[in-house]
UniProtKB/Swiss-Prot annotation:
The lineage of its organism: Bacteria, Bacillati, Mycoplasmatota, Mollicutes, Entomoplasmatales. Keywords: Ribonucleoprotein, Ribosomal protein, RNA-binding, rRNA-binding. Belongs to the bacterial ribosomal protein bL31 family. Type A subfamily. GO terms for biological process: translation. Pfam families: Ribosomal_L31. GO terms for cellular component: ribonucleoprotein complex; ribosome. This is Large ribosomal subunit protein bL31. Binds the 23S rRNA. HAMAP family: Ribosomal_bL31_1 (MF_00501). The gene is rpmE.
Amino acid sequence: MPKKDIQPKYFEEAKFICTTCANEFICGTTKREEMRIDVCSNCHPFFSGAQNFANTTGRVEQFKSKFARKEAINATAQKNSEDQKSKNKENK
């Protein structure tokens, strides 16, 4: 005998909203009534045939900018350290 009420709730008319082109369509899902997606078939290059980029500042770009700032700070700290070492040698 199968257990009762173990299946997830199914939303037959869930609203999907594309965050890139603001296209909306209705489809069934078990997640939630309104879903936001990054790319849909309306704006995806495979389906549209155009090579346009959706989000230019994604996670990778944010990581690269954060890493570049860290490298700049490390370079400044290294330079200050070398300057301090040279001053210490002069004072001896």
